[in-house]
């Protein structure tokens, strides 16, 4: 446990940020999972709609600093590739 007052505050701040990041990351992963399920089911219309939702969630998480922009771009690219393979 920290003894310095500012470090005690940082511990609290870091915990809040960790929980916020965890919630955002979990939501993004859920959207990606839904996209993969739509692709696996062979439902192209649902997959296209879910790709839009997942991409938007990824972009929002990048602006909040949860994912690195290159990591999000990679995930979006892989999802687009999976969607294009369905055709």
Swiss-Prot record:
One of its GO terms (molecular function) is structural constituent of ribosome. GO terms for cellular component: cytosol; small ribosomal subunit. It comes from the Bacteria. Signal peptide: none annotated. One of its GO terms (biological process) is translation. Keywords: Ribonucleoprotein, Ribosomal protein, RNA-binding, rRNA-binding. Disulfide bonds: none annotated. NCBIfam families: S20 (TIGR00029). Binds directly to 16S ribosomal RNA. HAMAP family: Ribosomal_bS20. This is Small ribosomal subunit protein bS20. The gene is rpsT.
